[in-house]
Amino acid sequence: MRLFVGLGNPGAKYQGNRHNIGFMVIDEIARRHGFSPWRRRFQGETADGVLDGERITLLKPLTYMNESGRAVQDAASFYKIGQNEIAVFHDEIELPPAKVRVKVGGGIAGHNGLRSISAHIGNDYLRVRLGVGHPGAKELVHNHVLGDFAKSERPWVEALCEIAADNAGLIAKGKDASFANKVHLAMQAKGFYDNDKQAKGGERDK
């Protein structure tokens, strides 16, 4: 089995924040693939289902972003799974809006949710990095990620969540590069990317 973690903050106040795009994608996976109803456990909410023959548990930590690792550690301990069976979907300010990159391990780029997870379980889990853009100055980052997506951004946000959810089975199968490529091509076909920009994915897909 695999654990898919979406990062965000709980509550209506944060629901539309850029920081919550991980929650949004995980919610869409549950909706589009007929997962079980959400229930409270592991200091979060979970839903269970199957993607491309792989058993998946979705987890949305309710600890607030900075303590996400506590929920991930609880779930990983319960299921007795290692870092290689965990995928974390999170907002990424170092990527342009709507861009997606997939990688195993690496730095945390100042992301407090990733910092907490790495502190609790180690650093070698899969990250599905969902671009939300950079506001241009370090002092603006806090308000940027805790701000809601603008009305003009909603079309690509909705499209990205749907396309990522439709192709999530590739992540379940360990085909990270194929996932990134499929998302890129589908978003490009909808007109959200420039044609001259190439998507780059993970390295595990052979």
UniProtKB/Swiss-Prot annotation:
Catalytic activity reported: an N-acyl-L-alpha-aminoacyl-tRNA + H2O = an N-acyl-L-amino acid + a tRNA + H(+)
EC number per UniProt: 3.1.1.29
Keyword RNA-binding: yes
GO terms (BP aspect): protein quality control for misfolded or incompletely synthesized proteins; rescue of stalled ribosome
Protein name in UniProt: Peptidyl-tRNA hydrolase
SUPFAM superfamilies (UniProt xref): Peptidyl-tRNA hydrolase-like (SSF53178)
This protein's encoding gene: pth
Disulphide-bridged cysteine pairs: none
Primary enzyme class: hydrolase
Record site feature (Discriminates between blocked and unblocked aminoacyl-tRNA), residues: 9
Record lineage: Bacteria, Pseudomonadati, Pseudomonadota, Alphaproteobacteria, Hyphomicrobiales
Family membership noted in the UniProt record: Belongs to the PTH family.
Keywords in alphabetical order: Cytoplasm, Hydrolase, RNA-binding, tRNA-binding
One GO CC term, this protein: cytoplasm
